[in-house]
């Protein structure tokens, strides 16, 4: 869907564009998105928004896709002598932070079969860049990054969803997340070490 094609009237900026819809959705947060809420943020009626986006499901998918598009993947630091394992740990941390920053985004980005061509292209380019930087096979890079992203997103989503649940015990979001983040990091380190071992790759491999 191309919301930008129709020319806006002279002197008046368009109120409904894909970028503005995404900005409003990100501000509201995926779990709280409604047609009325996004329309209100854009300064239009919800019926006007319906003319551009036919369903709530498509509206949420549009916002999630834009969140993913804006995500700047952690890339190898050529010349810094960062080992492959250290890089993968840093990438894992960025995956966790992504899930924490954007509650509700995980179901839209973890399933390859519902990913858009643009999302798949971005993933492929990242895998290719890591393969070239560390001089490993593209399929090895794909297995490493896909494994870390999948399990990192799934686990982080569970951690932060659990921390946001009401409990009968007095606690704080910060205290709960700090404890669970430590366990998550430990588990991801073990996953990374195991993935490198399975692929017979040197953890200290430098770019």
Write out the residue ranges for each language-model feature:
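C-terminal peripheral helix-coil segments that are non-catalytic and often amphipathic
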Residues: 1-4, 161-207
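HTH DNA-binding helix-turn interface
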Residues: 29-30, 43, 50-61
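Amphipathic alpha-helical packing segments from all-alpha helical-bundle domains
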Residues: 90, 110-146, 182
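Hydrophobic alpha-helical connector segments
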Residues: 73-105, 110-112, 148
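Short, amphipathic alpha-helix enriched in basic
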Residues: 5, 12-37
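Amphipathic alpha-helical segments used for helix-helix packing
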Residues: 96-124, 157-167
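Key DNA-contact positions within bacterial/archaeal DNA-binding proteins
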Residues: 36, 45-48
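Short, basic, alpha-helical segments at the C-terminal edge of helix-turn-helix-like DNA-binding modules
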Residues: 65-72
């Amino acid at each position: 869907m191309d919301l930008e094609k129709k020319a806006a009237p002279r002197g008046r900026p368009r109120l409904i564009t894909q970028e503005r819809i995404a900005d409003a959705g990100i501000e509201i947060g995926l779990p709280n998105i409604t047609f009325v809420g996004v329309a209100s943020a854009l300064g239009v009626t919800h019926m006007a928004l319906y003319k551009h986006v036919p369903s709530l499901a498509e509206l949420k998918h549009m916002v999630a896709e834009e969140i993913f598009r804006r995500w700047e993947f952690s890339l190898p630091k050529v010349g810094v002598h960062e080992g492959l394992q250290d890089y993968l740990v840093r990438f894992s941390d960025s995956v966790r932070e992504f899930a924490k920053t954007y509650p509700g985004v995980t179901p839209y980005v973890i399933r390859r079969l519902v990913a858009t061509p643009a999302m798949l292209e971005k993933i492929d380019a990242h895998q290719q860049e890591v393969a070239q930087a560390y001089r490993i096979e593209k399929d090895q890079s794909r297995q490493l990054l896909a494994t870390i992203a999948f399990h990192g997103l799934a686990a982080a989503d569970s951690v932060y969803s659990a921390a946001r649940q009401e409990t009968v015990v007095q606690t704080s979001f910060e205290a709960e997340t700090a404890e669970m983040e430590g366990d998550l990091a430990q588990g991801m380190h073990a996953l990374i070490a195991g993935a490198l071992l399975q692929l017979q790759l040197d953890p200290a491999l430098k770019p």
